């Protein structure tokens, strides 16, 4: 493996948005550690990556298991001795509870402690703990990108979306704190969202016409910008893939798709004594 090749970890990489982003990075020459629970789908990524500039290393892991984070990092470091990019994408959606959630909302009083714990573990705790495991190596190298897939702000406060919306809101809040903690380290923390209902396995059967949904590949252009040298100084931002204009040069497209990470646009710091 060439010494100047960059390494990325992508969680939830075997299907949907995660697969599109992982293969986009492979196409850009990254060596990608593709993390997912589904070993069979992970294995199919090897053939898809064949002949591309980068490589795929499938890594089966359950991110609800606290032991998985250090194992993933060890795998990535064992391949190249470096980790340049962490893409926190793994998540569970409302359809895992009720496939018809689109017209039969999951009310908050239906949410059991077990369901709440499961959604928090995967959608909020996992990205935080993955960053905790990866970032010290990035800081030591003086460079690194943490990119986390959350969801549209409207989804975070939507009727019937306590499980998914609130857990993704927790993840975004955490990434804003990471961004503040990382100032001056050479490592950045940003959020990337599709900007609408996307045609992935997370979506239930009654969420509308799949032909009219956003496609997972919409995430690739903003992701490739965020991992490029042109995005070196960008921190504490959220990028909305649906607003990315592929007819523009990447820096101009980024300006159109970029807003502050939640909730910096409305945040007011509390009054401190003294």
Where are these regions (language model features)?
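Canonical Rossmann dinucleotide-binding motif of NAD(H)/NADP(H)-dependent dehydrogenases/reductases
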Residues: 2-33
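Conserved glycine-rich Rossmann-like NAD(P)H-binding loop of the short-chain dehydrogenase/reductase
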Residues: 28-44
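The beta1-alpha1 cofactor-binding region of Rossmann-like NAD(H)/NADP(H)-dependent oxidoreductases
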Residues: 39-40, 60-72, 113
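Conserved mid-core segment of classical short-chain dehydrogenase/reductases
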Residues: 70, 93-117, 140, 160-163
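C-terminal helical subdomain
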Residues: 184, 191-192, 208-274
